[in-house]
Amino acid sequence: MSESVLIVGTGPGLSTSLARLCFSKGLKVALASRNIEKLNDLKKEIKAETFICDASNVKDVSNLFKQTDKSIGTPNLVIYNASSRPKKNSVVELDPIETQKSINITCFGAFLVAQEAAKRMLKRKSGSIFFTGATAGVKGFANSSVFAMGKFGLRGLAQSLARELHPQGIHVAHFVIDGVINKESSGDYQTIHPDEIAKTYLQLHHQ
């Protein structure tokens, strides 16, 4: 019986590499994003299911999993790759409402997705829930307070869930991406190729 994967927060870079790799390994693929029009080419390429979802919205996430259950079956692997940071980073310039929205997407959305995934995976006592973190979740940098809050919270969520769910057969992992992922917006930075990162995710899922 083939496995399935749900990737939440799909865009260029790592999410696309993950989707392609999973498809090449025989997994059924579902992709979720606030803007699915940008996924049209990828959808056709790998025959993926695509769903509109604001990961910080309780109803959206609940509906996403119901739709995924019907289309590709309950996912064996769920990857939370959504994150957000405001345009302005200085603490005195940050808008509180935009700050809250960013934290909700980066951290609270991860909780909502993990909760729905765990409800399903616990029934069969297997599955993987993966979170994409960043160096900002380990070390807070100047002018990056909002991103740091979200990513620190994400790391704490992952650690707690790993201890709670591992005894029941569910694999929870948090990946710290310590560098800039190679994509069009990366500029001239030294970058990490997303295909190589994607291989690590799938290897860990199959351990």
Describe the predicted segments one by one.
Residues 83-97, 143:
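Conserved mid-core segment of classical short-chain dehydrogenase/reductases
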Residues 9, 102, 128-153, 159, ...:
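Catalytic loop of short-chain dehydrogenase/reductase
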Residues 46-59:
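Rossmann-fold cofactor-recognition segment
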Residues 167-207:
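C-terminal helical subdomain
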Residues 114-115, 159:
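A short, exposed helix-loop element centered on a Lys and neighboring polar residues
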Residues 3, 74-75, 121-133, 167-170:
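Active-site loop of short-chain dehydrogenase/reductase
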Residues 92-111, 130, 154:
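Catalytic Tyr-X3-Lys loop
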